[in-house]
């Protein structure tokens, strides 16, 4: 198989370096429920702001509730922030089960949380930290949320 070595721009109506609000411009997500991991810092908080700006009900799991509540003050209510630590699978399962009971439908899942270039460490279950948090934790969350 040959892969083209020349890229051609496509007209999406979105600039090459869009703001989060530009990406959701024109959308109406009223009545939709979104889950954003890592939603209390960096790209995650901008994602939460963009989704709420077009009507979505956004839930943010966090391993540091106080930090998340402070960061998201004025963006989403504190009761839409739940305790979850992606490095601890029972915590992930507990959050997923609580979410599933509280919200019968999940319309949007954005798995944004992650760690990078961290020193060698292990999760509660003995997995390498980066693999456990970035991949296995999110996979476990998805499995818990699926019917």
Predicted regions and their residues:
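Conserved glycine-rich Rossmann-like NAD(P)H-binding loop of the short-chain dehydrogenase/reductase
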Residues: 54-70
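A glycine-rich helix->loop->beta "capping" turn
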Residues: 76-79, 98-111, 117-122
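Non-catalytic terminal and boundary segments that flank Rossmann-like NAD(P)-dependent oxidoreductase
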Residues: 1-35, 97
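The beta1-alpha1 cofactor-binding region of Rossmann-like NAD(H)/NADP(H)-dependent oxidoreductases
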Residues: 65, 81-97
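Amphipathic alpha-helical dimer-interface segment in Rossmann-like NAD(P)H-dependent oxidoreductases
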Residues: 133-147
């Amino acid at each position: 198989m040959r892969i083209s070595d020349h890229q051609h721009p496509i007209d999406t109506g979105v600039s090459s370096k869009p703001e989060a609000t530009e990406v959701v411009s024109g959308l109406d997500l009223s009545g939709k429920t979104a889950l954003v991991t890592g939603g209390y810092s960096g790209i995650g908080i901008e994602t939460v702001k963009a989704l709420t700006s077009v009507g979505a009900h956004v839930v943010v799991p966090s391993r540091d509730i106080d930090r998340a509540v402070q960061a998201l003050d004025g963006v989403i209510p504190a009761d839409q922030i739940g305790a979850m630590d992606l490095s601890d699978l029972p915590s992930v399962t507990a959050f997923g089960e609580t979410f599933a009971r509280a919200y019968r439908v999940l319309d949007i899942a954005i798995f944004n949380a992650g760690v990078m270039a961290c020193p060698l460490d292990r999760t509660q279950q003995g997995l390498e930290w980066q693999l456990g948090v970035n991949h296995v934790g999110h996979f476990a969350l998805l499995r818990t949320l699926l019917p």
